[in-house]
Amino acid sequence: MKGLAFCTAILFLVGSLPGQEAPSPADVARYGQYPADYKEIIMKWLDTQLVDAPSARIEWTSEPKATDYEKNGEHFYGYLVTFTVNARNRFGTYTGKQRHGAVIKNGEVIKGLGLGY
């Protein structure tokens, strides 16, 4: 009897754990599709932002998270990804790790954080 009560309690607790729910249509309309290929999207964007993009050493510090990023009264809805970049500058020396982020919506970066933004 105790074993049955224990198993029932465990099933109840496991069933109530928060899981990765499918985004609602309203969320997709606001934030866009979840960027499963976020690393490729950001690397392509960094190619246009860095002086020596091939030298970039990237460390990903977060998975994409739905966000409402606001700056100067303007809202950017999408998925925020944070990362560090260590790349060569115009003088050919590495800059050291610097924290950056990007807001992705529908497969493209709509707002960069860091990199002079």
Which residues make up each language-model segment?
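Sec-dependent N-terminal signal peptides
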Residues: 4-14
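Cystatin/cathelin-like cysteine-protease inhibitor module
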Residues: 20-117
